[in-house]
Design a protein with these regions (language model features):
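Carbohydrate-interacting/catalytic domains
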Residues: 2, 6, 21, 101-103, ...
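Immunoglobulin-like IPT/TIG beta-sandwich domains and homologous Ig-like subdomains
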Residues: 37-100
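Substrate-binding/active-site clefts of carbohydrate-active enzymes
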Residues: 136-182, 186-338, 343, 362-371, ...
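Active-site-proximal helices and loops of the catalytic beta/alpha 8
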Residues: 224, 242, 251, 336-338, ...
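Active-site clefts of carbohydrate-active enzymes
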Residues: 447-470
């Protein structure tokens, strides 16, 4: 358990204090690289006892050692190489000379499997399906006790690990294909070797290793390949703002400024002990924690005190805040993301806690990724509550003095208003479906509103459904809007089978297991027979829209024209070339009768005939029409 970790820590500290200790090379990150990259510069972070002061040399045609960075710890060395255009795939011989002793290592250079310019990202033609690997399905393939910290698989505890694996996801790709999603976003899969199991994945302890409780690096790459064979893209969840408290760095920090608000070594040990025992101590109380007030990042009147607390404060005591202003650390993180794109073939990155990291450093990262993969997409989690704040984070915003270079932002204002928008009666100009109209009217703030990730819920929010519904009218209305408005829709796993829950007690209640994904489950929603009649109705409704959406340019690239719901009916049109569709939604629990349709002559006239996308029925526009309570029509 902890013995192994503290033994390693002790050895590293002993190395720091012993001048005559033998020099060693234990690890090099990245573990390998590729020839033919657009950026020919490569940083190799070398870790090993006493390695800092060793003298390195490189022997490989086309590869040049440009410089060596030596920081505070004696156990790290940073090599900066140029991988020239004439470098060939193979091995790079690296020698570290320490006194009379020489350590020889071979570093592997691989040939790129494809052209970065053609590497496909996700966009508004896709629908992302967000799932938590620990909670989706157990493939029965992983030996679970494979970490330094003890933990339990306990499905009765919403805060414990439940045993989901990457193979469990692979086993149910037929289900995702049947549903009709075109991309999956997995919450973080990298190693989180932390007390309690850290099932959610947001406390990385190894940036180059898939958590063994999910599977291996090869398993991850295999899953992505299987997804691609079915036309499903994969988005990887990453965190640059912080790492896990028990990352090896925390036992021997490379430099005095590797972390923001960096405690002393003894202080870190005390914080680790407090997290292990669950008992606060003075070290925890003295930590600078974030104030979570993200409006400080764009506040023109912000005090330095408040700003520093936002971006330099630790997220929680178990997640040390990384200092992206340290150029060696930022290069490490940039290369890590490029490594996963090249190694695994991911199609996008969702960057957690985006505004908490240094804005200029993150812009450097976005530029670096776009240089290698121009069609790749990155979405930043910017949990801001109004449209202007969200727009500020997107690249090309004219009010932000820093061009963030961030292509896609998350439409949190839509998420935060969703339950009211579809739960209230649409009467005044500010309630019910008017909220959607007013929200879209602010799209002029965005540099590119087609690059908004639209969603109603995720693993950090209440589910859209707080309890099991008895009627699907409002739910269908909400899903129809999400899948037909501008942006890139994201649905949370289980939405299609009416999973519900609130995080009022604990986040675990909005992260429940997918029924049928685990041994012993009494029902399985992965098959139609395992779903209730209401679940079948919900699944079929969503599946029809998702399949209709695939390849539909009117949805992915169409212009949008909408009519304010002053008569309780919200109507909008999407058009691209000769393809278009119209959506009509009754925003009340009462039927609308004898609605004068003349106000919509810009998009439809009496006698025009459409096909109802859901039912397949023909619908002919009349001068006056009636709509049942909460009716939703998608007409093509």
């Amino acid at each position: 358990m902890m013995k192994k970790i503290f033994l390693v820590a002790g050895l590293l500290l002993a190395g720091a204090m012993t001048t005559n200790a033998k020099t060693a090379v234990d690890r090099m990150d990245p573990p390998m690289w590729w020839t033919g990259m657009e950026n020919q510069q490569l940083q190799i972070m070398v870790t090993g006892e006493g390695i800092r002061d060793a003298v390195p040399s490189v022997d490989c045609p086309g590869v040049k050692l440009d410089s060596v960075a030596r920081l505070d710890s004696p156990n790290y060395q940073f090599l900066y190489l140029t991988i020239g255009s004439d470098a060939k795939p193979g091995t790079v011989d690296i020698t570290f000379a320490s006194g009379k002793r020489k350590i020889k290592k071979q570093y592997e250079l691989l040939a790129r499997q494809g052209d970065g310019a053609s590497h496909e990202g996700f966009d508004s033609s896709d629908v992302l399906y967000l799932m938590m690997p620990d909670r989706f399905a157990d493939g029965g393939d992983v030996k679970h006790q494979s970490t330094n910290f003890d933990y339990r698989i306990d499905r009765t505890n919403p805060g414990a690990r439940h045993g989901g694996t990457l193979k469990g996801i692979s086993d149910h790709l037929d289900y995702l294909e049947e549903l009709g999603v075109t991309a999956v976003w997995l919450t973080p899969v990298l190693e989180n070797d932390m007390p309690g199991g850290c099932y959610h994945g947001y406390a990385t302890t190894d940036y180059y290793r898939v958590d063994p409780r999910f599977g291996s690096n090869d398993d991850y790459r295999r899953l992505i390949s299987e997804c691609h064979s079915r036309g499903i893209k994969v988005v990887m969840d990453m965190i640059f703002n912080h790492c896990g408290l028990y990352h090896p760095w925390l036992y021997d920090l490379p430099s005095h400024d590797w972390l923001n608000a960096q405690p002393t070594a003894d202080g870190i040990r005390s914080v680790q002990q407090a997290n292990l025992t669950g008992k606060r101590n003075a070290a925890v109380d003295s930590l600078l924690l974030t104030n979570f007030r993200l409006n400080t990042v764009h506040d023109p009147y912000v005090s330095q005190y408040d700003f520093n607390h936002t971006v330099d404060g630790w997220f929680v005591s178990g997640m040390p805040d990384l200092n992206q202003r340290n150029p060696h650390l930022m290069t490490y993180l940039i290369q890590n993301s490029i490594w996963w794109i090249e190694y695994a073939g991911i199609n996008g990155i969702r960057m957690d806690t985006y505004p908490y990291a240094d804005m200029e450093a993150m812009a450097r990262w976005n530029r670096a990724v776009a240089r290698e993969y121009p069609r790749f997409n990155i979405v930043g989690e910017s949990w801001l509550e109004n449209e202007a704040s969200i727009a500020y984070m997107q690249r090309g915003n004219k009010l932000n003095p820093v061009n963030t270079e961030l292509p896609t932002v998350m439409d949190f204002p839509l998420c935060l208003m969703a339950q009211q928008a579809f739960g209230e009666q649409t009467k005044s100009g500010s309630d019910g479906l008017n909220r959607l109209f007013n929200h879209l009217a602010l799209d002029m703030l965005y540099a590119d509103c087609s690059r908004l990730l639209t969603f109603y819920d995720n693993h950090d929010t209440d589910r859209f459904l707080l309890e099991e519904p008895s009627d699907l009218a409002r739910w269908k209305q909400a899903q129809a809007f999400l899948l037909t408005t501008r942006g890139i829709p994201q649905i949370y796993y289980g939405t299609e089978v009416l999973m519900h829950g609130s995080k009022a007690v604990t986040d675990g209640y909005v992260r429940l297991d997918m029924p049928g994904g685990f041994p012993g489950d009494s029902v399985s929603v992965f098959t139609a027979d395992g779903r209730t009649p209401l679940q079948r109705d919900a699944f079929n409704f969503m599946s029809r829209l998702l399949h209709w959406r695939q390849g539909n340019k009117a949805v992915s690239a169409g212009t949008l024209r909408h009519f304010m719901p002053s008569n309780q009916l919200y109507v909008y049109e999407r058009t691209n070339g000769d393809r278009r569709f119209i959506v009509l939604m009754n925003g009340t629990d009462e039927p609308l009768t004898d609605v004068d349709m003349s106000r919509y002559v810009e998009i439809m006239r009496p006698g025009d005939t459409f096909r109802d996308v859901i039912t397949g029925d023909a619908v002919t526009v009349a001068p006056h029409m009636s709509f049942p309570a909460r009716a939703t029509l998608v007409l093509e």
